Amino acid sequence: MNRLFRLLPLASLVLTACSLHTPQGPGKSPDSPQWRQHQQAVRSLNQFQTRGAFAYLSDEQKVYARFFWQQTGQDRYRLLLTNPLGSTELSLTAQPGSVQLIDNKGQTYTATDAEEMIGRLTGMPIPLNSLRQWIIGLPGDATDYSLDDQYRLRELNYTQNGKTWHVTYGGYTSDTQPALPSNVELNNGAQRIKLKMDNWIVK
């Protein structure tokens, strides 16, 4: 399973637009009422989905893929990673107390922790438990963060299991209300994860 994504570097072209452009301008205070209002609006999104380009980069492996994220409830979501031909390389479905992962050979795995499972089976320590919040522009459990000049997350730092993740937001889309991220990068020094969202559908 650790070689699940051996063929995916062929998809590197899909990330040509995935370079980050950190928002410039004066930041705003995390104590501002505008930020609290934005957080409240984002937290009210119980169901949403997004798709786009995914990259995982480390000294051990480089993975490029297309991703699809569907949130159907507070603790219910589905993550798909597909190759350039559109075939599913990984399908992960999570709900409270249960996680199911199906690989590209149809093998099914079950566990109770999505983050531990995907790290163990793919060799990619993706912080899924926090990413569920970060992907929509919320800090989650992070307390060290800053805002851009539109009262949205610009960057954050979060230490988990001895690793400090630095998360930067390269932009937001104006196609949704509230505005949602269009470009996110996670970096802990040894690994980088890039997400470029093509679009959002919110309910």
UniProtKB/Swiss-Prot annotation:
Lipidated residue numbers (S-diacylglycerol cysteine): 18
Subcellular location: Cell outer membrane
Listed name of the protein: Outer-membrane lipoprotein LolB
Record membrane topology: Lipid-anchor
GO biological process, one term: protein transport
Main function: Plays a critical role in the incorporation of lipoproteins in the outer membrane after they are released by the LolA protein.
Sorted UniProt keywords: Cell outer membrane, Chaperone, Lipoprotein, Membrane, Palmitate, Protein transport, Signal, Transport
Record NCBIfam families: lolB
Biological classification of the source: Bacteria, Pseudomonadati, Pseudomonadota, Gammaproteobacteria, Enterobacterales
One GO CC term, this protein: cell outer membrane
Key word Transport present: yes
Subunit composition and interactions: Monomer.
